[in-house]
Design a protein with these regions (language model features):
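Conserved glycine-rich cofactor-binding loop
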Residues: 15-17
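Short, small/polar-rich loop/turn modules that mediate ligand/substrate recognition or access, typified
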Residues: 179, 184, 240-242
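Catalytic Tyr-X3-Lys loop
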Residues: 101-121, 142, 167, 216
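Alpha-helical segment proximal to the catalytic Tyr-Lys
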Residues: 128, 176-177, 238
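Conserved glycine-rich Rossmann-like NAD(P)H-binding loop of the short-chain dehydrogenase/reductase
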Residues: 29-45
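C-terminal substrate-recognition "lid" of short-chain dehydrogenase/reductases
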Residues: 218-247
Length: 251
């Protein structure tokens, strides 16, 4: 597989929120981008149109928790770009707040499949392609975890927190597996960020309610997380692997 002319990145779950913000940052850096979405095609297509004035971009619908759809997604990337050099594992869900005693197996399995299996599958397919590239080509993966991996989110989202704890472990283990090939693997742990995900958890204004707990006294913005992701992807972080960066305002 020949090396892409420019850094080429897949950002899963990038129709809105942190994923969309990351796409915008990387587009301004002239990276080639694959926008991925599961169901909100209008947001993803609008973003694709916006970024197409800056760089080469494709938009692919796929549920990255389903292996067959992941394979099809990467096949489209191969066709459009000849492969990829970078991956942002961003896709994930949050379900309505409840204590563990009220959770059933269906909910827990959905959470783990969407938030964990998806990252394993995409990391596997990305690594296959990265390993075919010359070691002179910079290659990196950034997994999106959460500050919940540290706090546990008791009485709200212990299943979500557990899924993100798994991502921290994946990041560490995979970074060691891929280090001999020069492929870097890191993660970011966003804290309370102003995105739509809180509404899906049943509390649209959760960031405002909890902002006084944050040492910086405010919630974060998606582009603040995006810039951290972009740095970890870039050659400025060429000696950084196996690291998990908290983007939490000090929480």
């Amino acid at each position: 597989m020949s090396a892409p002319l420019h850094p080429t990145v897949l950002i899963t779950g990038s129709g809105k929120g942190i994923g969309a913000a990351t796409a915008k940052v990387l587009a301004r850096m002239n990276w080639r981008i694959c926008i991925n979405f599961r169901s909100d095609n209008s947001s993803a297509e609008a973003l694709t149109e916006e970024l197409s004035t800056l760089t080469e971009v494709i938009c692919v619908q796929a549920d990255v928790a389903i292996e067959e759809q992941v394979l099809a997604l990467f096949a489209q990337i191969d066709t459009a770009f000849g492969g990829l050099t970078h991956l942002v594992n961003n896709a994930g869900i949050l379900l309505p707040q409840m204590p563990l005693l009220e959770m059933d197996a269906e909910r827990v399995n959905r959470m783990l499949t969407t938030n964990v299996t998806s990252q394993f599958l995409c990391a596997r397919e990305a690594a296959k392609r990265m390993l075919k590239l010359s070691t002179s080509v910079d290659r990196a993966i950034v997994n999106v975890s959460s500050g919940a991996a540290r706090t546990g989110s008791p009485n709200e989202y212990v299943d979500y927190a557990a899924s993100k704890g798994a991502i921290d472990t994946l990041t560490k283990g995979l970074s060691i597996e891929l280090a001999p090939a020069g492929i870097r693997v890191n993660a970011v742990r966003p804290g309370l960020i102003h995105t739509d995900i809180h509404a899906k958890g049943g509390e649209h204004d959760r960031v405002e309610r909890l902002k006084n707990r944050i040492p910086l006294g405010r919630g974060g913005e998606p582009d603040e997380v995006a810039r951290a992701i972009a740095w970890l992807l870039s050659t400025d972080a060429s000696f950084v692997t196996g690291s998990i960066m908290d983007v939490t305002g000090g929480l």
